[in-house]
């Protein structure tokens, strides 16, 4: 028995710059009852730091005028022709469905981003065609599912073929007494993530509250936002296991995205570590941390005001941290079971 998981081309299934999809698969496959039957197909240049042994790095060598994506899929199909799969799970690339469907019709399609922004699911016709072809479509959040359903027949709203299975993480063992006066920002240091607004707010806050520090983890080579303060530490990119340690000891985590986050891995991780989480009310972010403070209108003043409230009111901060932590339910165990439930049904059918 074989289950094939195909990643988007360039999804880095490695501890170096691992994306949210890679982290999710690593954690849930380890807990799957089918873990010995699963093969992951992808492409990365970081071959020394692969996250799992059952990974196949597909060749992308091409000739002139060939699409790298087409070469990538063709190489996957070569593997499939040699040893066919009982089930194929396609992640975040609806345009892969057409070619894979020709040789295997037991397909599951995952959406980790807004379907309306992805090649192969932008139009109503494309989305209707996907519903006809694949056995199941999995969405990272209700928000991404609702985006997919725009213009689709209302009968599909409660159709079991379309299911929300969120990302997950381990609920960390923490001590609230060991939390430190740290304001944490994790993510790409760009305007989409609201880093420019965070930077402007944080320098003012650190002047007002000199016994607090701010830590920034992440990078962004395409944008350059420079903020300096003696209590502001910018660490650059760090591996996931290192980032988790900072979440565990930080009092406050800020996820102030401008764009509609499909879900919000950072908010999820912060919640699992009992941070007082501040998010923008955008996209699927509220689903990642339902009890977080939500900012409806993002600007430096509003962000600064909400962080200040947590800093000044210690009782409010502690209650918020415990409420977020105690109500955290999106564990890897829960999500791995949900995934295995549909696998069992589709393999038997």
Where in this protein do the model-derived segments appear?
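A short, active-site helix/loop in glycosyltransferases that binds the activated sugar's phosphate group
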Residues: 120, 127, 132-160
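Conserved donor-binding/catalytic core segment of Leloir-type glycosyltransferases
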Residues: 4, 138, 175-193, 199-202
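Short alpha-helical donor nucleotide-sugar binding micro-motif in glycosyltransferases
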Residues: 237-238, 246-250
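N-terminal strand-loop element at the rim of the active site
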Residues: 7-15, 24-67, 96, 158
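Short hydrophobic beta-strand element within catalytic cores of glycosyltransferases
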Residues: 276-279
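Nucleotide-activated donor-binding/catalytic signature segment of Leloir-type glycosyltransferases, i.e.
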Residues: 223-241
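Conserved acidic donor-binding segment of nucleotide-sugar-dependent glycosyltransferases
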Residues: 292-301, 309-315
């Amino acid at each position: 028995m074989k289950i094939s998981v195909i990643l988007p081309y360039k999804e880095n299934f490695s501890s170096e710059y691992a994306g949210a999809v890679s982290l999710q698969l690593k954690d849930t496959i380890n807990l799957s009852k089918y873990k010995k039957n699963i093969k992951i197909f992808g492409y990365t240049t970081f071959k020394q730091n692969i996250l799992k042994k059952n990974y196949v790095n597909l060749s992308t060598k091409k000739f002139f005028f060939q699409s790298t994506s087409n070469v990538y899929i063709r190489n996957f199909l070569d593997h499939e022709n040699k040893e066919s799969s009982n089930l194929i799970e396609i992640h975040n690339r609806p345009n892969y469905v057409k070619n894979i469907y020709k040789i295997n019709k037991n397909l599951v399609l995952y959406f980790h981003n807004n379907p309306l922004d992805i090649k192969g699911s932008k139009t109503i016709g494309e989305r209707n065609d996907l519903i006809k072809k694949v056995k199941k479509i999995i969405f990272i959040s209700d928000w991404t599912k609702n985006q997919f359903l725009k213009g689709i027949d209302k009968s599909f709203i409660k159709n079991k073929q379309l299911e929300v299975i969120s990302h997950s993480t381990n609920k960390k063992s923490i001590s609230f007494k060991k939390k430190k006066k740290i304001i944490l920002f994790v993510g790409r240091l760009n305007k989409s993530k609201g880093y420019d607004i965070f930077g402007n707010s944080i320098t003012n806050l650190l002047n007002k509250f000199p016994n607090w520090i701010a830590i920034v983890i992440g990078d962004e080579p395409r944008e350059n936002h420079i903020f300096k303060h003696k209590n502001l530490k910018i660490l650059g990119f760090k591996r996931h296991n290192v980032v988790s340690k900072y979440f565990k000891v930080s009092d406050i985590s800020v996820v102030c995205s401008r764009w509609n986050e499909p879900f919000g891995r950072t908010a999820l991780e912060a919640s699992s570590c009992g941070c007082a989480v501040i998010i923008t009310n955008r996209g699927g972010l509220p689903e990642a941390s339902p009890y977080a403070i939500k900012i409806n209108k993002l600007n430096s003043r509003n962000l600064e005001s909400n962080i200040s409230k947590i800093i000044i009111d210690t009782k409010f901060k502690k209650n918020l941290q415990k409420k977020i932590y105690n109500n955290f339910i999106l564990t890897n165990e829960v999500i791995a079971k949900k995934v295995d439930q549909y696998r069992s049904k589709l393999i038997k059918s």
